[in-house]
Amino acid sequence: MRVVQKQKFPIEGTKRLLPAASNQARGLGEYCRDFLFNPQNILPETIELIERFHVDSVGCAISAIHHRANACTLLRHEAMQTRPEGTSSGGFCFGASTPVNTTKCVAANVSAVREWDSNGTNFGYDKKSGRMAGEFGHNDFYPVAIAAGREAGFDGNQTLRLMLLIDEIRGRLAEVFPLRRYAIDHVHHGAIACAAGYTAALGGTTADVESAIGLVVSQYVPFRALRAGHQLSDSKGASAAFAAETAVMAAQRALHGFRGPQDVFRNPLAIYRLNEPSNDGMSPFDLELGESGNVFAIHAIDRK
């Protein structure tokens, strides 16, 4: 593995704080809607980085499909048997020209992106802010932004912004809550980010985003059993794919009016307070998210 040296540049821009004493799920909904539809200026070095990471991920995906890696081949075959539902425009699997069910498309494409384990890694460590929970994660979720952008009619710039939004949410969650300490797989932070970003992109309200997040946290938490044992299964490489799939499913249900658990970060029986007890009315952490400039978690990702 060769880690590319990060370029040094002045850090500038604004952030939004979601305090532990607030409804952070609702706050994420407001943040997502503002980030996508009331955009502030993002500096070129951030846009260039998200473009580079996306291109890298596509290269990984095409290689995995070409070599017929098992998990992504099976999930792609599964997706190609489907068609878009209702008024949905659906999504395209890598290398295909026929639209398929969006949820199945996302699972297939994220699996392909992730198969070679060659994308960037964030380590959940921001010494300046003191947020150093140290959870890691990978930028495997760009197919969710592509699918949502197609459904929403986004142009390329809007879709890049959605990619950045997903990376920002999962990157900042990694700084404040160490999933691995509680045997929870790191892709869960990505699932929350995907559910929030997808719901907002398709015009969901802040309440819809809150519901989608609540569904992901209460119904679809992946444990690290998928990485344990002497012989690892296809589930390890496909963990991000299944996280993305369930996130999009939760988002679609929320958009159709399903009400998931509210205020889930302060829910005493959700994974956060259950594992890191805090007083009533408090989550275990503040959450701070970049809004403009180059103050984004993506700049802490190591490139392989």
Predicted regions and their residues:
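N-terminal core-entry segment
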Residues: R2-V295
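Long hydrophobic segments that form regular secondary structure
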Residues: I298-K304
